[in-house]
Every structure is written in structure tokens, then in C-alpha cells.
């Protein structure tokens, strides 16, 4: 356990350091190198958990990192293969149709891995727009983003068996939002969006890690849950949703409608959970349990 903590601290330092280096890289090759080093820096986080499922999670993460890396470098080397770069980045961010690996990695790992995948590793989206030449590449990103929102909107009700499942849905939805916005918005505005997301996501992951495994949350945790996740006047969630919603609306109306559907589905699910706290889980419906 002590060795795992030391490895995780080392991985955290490398993860933050290489992510910062993305912003000072002066060519595409160095950008790709720092991006992959940041991804590999997450591997020590897996060793905090000794459960057998961690090996499946780690294997899936390494395979996806390798495949996406190959696609990205192929797109960077050959202009005619730019679509492969876009596909590689979509795979790395877990957008439709590449959402499955995100669930395998997050569900069978620990909350430190969940935090790393959900926050720091998302910083590379700020450079997504620089690789797009417009036309079909931008359309592909918007289509995949819109379909991601629609599928996640249903997944909240069909595939949520705990808080880590819920956050996997929410994180993929946020990834789709960030990637879609990177196509149209200015780098300055994207940086503000990411800083807001980084703070909000870190707070949510910290809270959900405390709630995980608790059948009936404490009253204080419920208030924090409402403040961070339920969109009502004065909550942090409503500011985040409005900010992101306005940004997505300025990008594409169709994608915005998909995001609205996903957000409404998420809010109704959370409200149903809060109303059902203390009610026997068999009364919630089939397949929905915490």
C-alpha cells in the first residue's frame, strides 16, 4: 500500500507536469510526446487498488492509449490521413462510438484514476480545434458529440448501478461538450470553460468517492450533492450548466438539443434518487440501484 501511494504521488507529479508541457510545446511532435507521457503517467494510480478487476481496467486503458496514439501520430504525419487524427482524439476522449472503454477503466479502478481521467487528461481538448481543417472533420466531431449526448441520456436510466456509473455517464457527457466547443470557440473562452470544469469535476469526484458504498448518505452529503449536481438557483451546477449550454448553443443548434436532452435526463435521474433516499431499492425499478 505504501509503495502504491509513492507511485501515485510520482504519477500525479508527472501527470500535471506533462499536461503543463502541452501548452509550451513548439511543434506537433513534442505535443504528441507530452500527450502520451501524460496518459502513461496515470498508470501508477491503478496500483492503489489490489482488486483483480484493476488488471482488466489497466489493460483496457493501455490498449486504448496505444491505439489512439497510433491514430493520432498517423494523422499528424500525413495530411491525407487527418481523419485518423480526429478518430484517435475521439477515442481518447471516449466519445461515440468509443464510449465502452471509459466504463471498463473507471468502474474497475479507484477514484484517483477516475479523477485523473476526468480532469487533468482532458486538458488536451484545448488544442483539438487546431487540428481540424473544417468541413467533414468538424461535421464528424459534431455528429459524434450529438450521438454521445443522446446515448448518455438513456444510459442514466438503463446503466446506472452506483455512483461510479453515474459519474462515467456525466464525465463522457462533459467530454463531448468540451470537444464540440473546441471546434468553434476561441482558446481564451475554452480555457475559462476548462478551469470551471476542472474545479467542479474535482469537487464532484471528491464527494462521490465519499458516497460510494453508502446506502443512505448523511444529510450533509445530500446538501453537497444538491449544490454540486442539481440545477437549482444558487447551486454551482446551474452556473456550470448555463455556462456550458450557452457555449454549445453558439456552436450548433442540433448538438445543443442533444445536450439539453442529456442534461434533463440527468437531472430527473438525480431528483428521483434524492426522492427515493430511504425507500427500498426494489421500488425504484429494475436495474436502478445504489
Model regions: which residues?
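Core, highly hydrophobic multi-pass alpha-helical transmembrane subunits of bioenergetic inner membranes
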Residues: 1-290
Amino acid at each position: 500500500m505504501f509503495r502504491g501511494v509513492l507511485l501515485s504521488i510520482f504519477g500525479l507529479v508527472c501527470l500535471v507536469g506533462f499536461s503543463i508541457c502541452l501548452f509550451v510545446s513548439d511543434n506537433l511532435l513534442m505535443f504528441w510526446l507530452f500527450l502520451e507521457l501524460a496518459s502513461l503517467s496515470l498508470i501508477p494510480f491503478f496500483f492503489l487498488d489490489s482488486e483483480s478487476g484493476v488488471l482488466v481496467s489497466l489493460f483496457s486503458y493501455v490498449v486504448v492509449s496505444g491505439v489512439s496514439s497510433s491514430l493520432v501520430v498517423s494523422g499528424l504525419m500525413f495530411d491525407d490521413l487527418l481523419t485518423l487524427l480526429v478518430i484517435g482524439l475521439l477515442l481518447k476522449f471516449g466519445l461515440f462510438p468509443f464510449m465502452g472503454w471509459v466504463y471498463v477503466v473507471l468502474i474497475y479502478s479507484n477514484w484517483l484514476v477516475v479523477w485523473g481521467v476526468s480532469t487533468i487528461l482532458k486538458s488536451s481538448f484545448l488544442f483539438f480545434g487546431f487540428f481540424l481543417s473544417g468541413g467533414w472533420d468538424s461535421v464528424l466531431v459534431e455528429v459524434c458529440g450529438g450521438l454521445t449526448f443522446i446515448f448518455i441520456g438513456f444510459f442514466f436510466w438503463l446503466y446506472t448501478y452506483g455512483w461510479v456509473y453515474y459519474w462515467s455517464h456525466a464525465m463522457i457527457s462533459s467530454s463531448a461538450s468540451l470537444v464540440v466547443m473546441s471546434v468553434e470557440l476561441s482558446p481564451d473562452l475554452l480555457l475559462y470553460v476548462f478551469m470551471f470544469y476542472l474545479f467542479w469535476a474535482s469537487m464532484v469526484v471528491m464527494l462521490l468517492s465519499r458516497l460510494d458504498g453508502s446506502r443512505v448518505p448523511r444529510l450533509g452529503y445530500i446538501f453537497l450533492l444538491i449544490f454540486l449536481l442539481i440545477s437549482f438557483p444558487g447551486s454551482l451546477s446551474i452556473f456550470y450548466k448555463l455556462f456550458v449550454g450557452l457555449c454549445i448553443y453558439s456552436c450548433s443548434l442540433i448538438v445543443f438539443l442533444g445536450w439539453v436532452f442529456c442534461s434533463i435526463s440527468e437531472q430527473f435521474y438525480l431528483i428521483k434518487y434524492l426522492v427515493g433516499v430511504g425507500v427500498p431499492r426494489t421500488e425504484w425499478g429494475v436495474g436502478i440501484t445504489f
